[in-house]
Amino acid sequence: MKITKIEKKKRLYTLELDNTENLYITEDTIVHFMLSKGMIVNAEKLENIKKFAQLSYGKNLGLYYISFKQRTEKELIKYLQQHDIDSKIIPQIIDNLKSENWINDKNYVQSFIQQNLNTGDKGPYVIKQKLLQKGIKSKIIESELQAINFQDLASKISQKLYKKYQNKLPLKALKDKLMQSLTTKGFDYQIAHTVIQNLEIEKDQELEEDLIYKELDKQYQKFSKKYDQYELKQRIINALMRKGYQYEDIKSALREYL
């Protein structure tokens, strides 16, 4: 078979043979096999050209995908599959890119954690789940997470949350809210408990009284038309306790309110 034409088409080249067969190949393929118009190729060489072209094209696709931002091995495999790269050569493409350090799940984890420490608000448990979803092995994630002390980040977040809720919630509800928020973000109970204790939050009696009477007004309006005196009182007490107010404070406020 003779090569009758090699023509550039955007990022690829078309290679035409005198047996009417056309191939899409990369520039690397042309260089590797030193292809030129008029060259004679046998069936074995043609098959090698096809395999190399597919491998080269897949690698170029991978490099293009990686050029926008860091990717995990799983993300890259999915991208290559979506672009119809032969599943048999994808492992070879991945190995090639890994050997040149274009993809490195350990480095990805390190960058992900560092970015979270700099600008994020997630603790290790949430970070681990996010990285697992990206196809990274658990042992790689855990190894990197164990090297990080998340207490400083938890402390910074607890201070922000405290400023947000300090004049809106009674002491118990405030501490519960901080604990719930920190654990939901992926920090373990011990770290959350420690940073909340370090805030040294004290009860503001004047604020608590103001908040409890505002809540009494709200709950009274809600229940007063539905329940009599005893049932009304119990409904209000239960509602306020669920919101973090202390039983004795509620009883004291009710004596003046009702």
UniProtKB/Swiss-Prot annotation:
Keyword vocabulary terms for this entry: Cytoplasm
Subcellular location: Cytoplasm
Domain of life: Bacteria
NCBIfam families for the chain: PRK14135.1
Similarity comment: Belongs to the RecX family.
Role, per record: Modulates RecA activity.
UniProt name for this protein: Regulatory protein RecX
Organism: Streptococcus agalactiae serotype Ia (strain ATCC 27591 / A909 / CDC SS700)
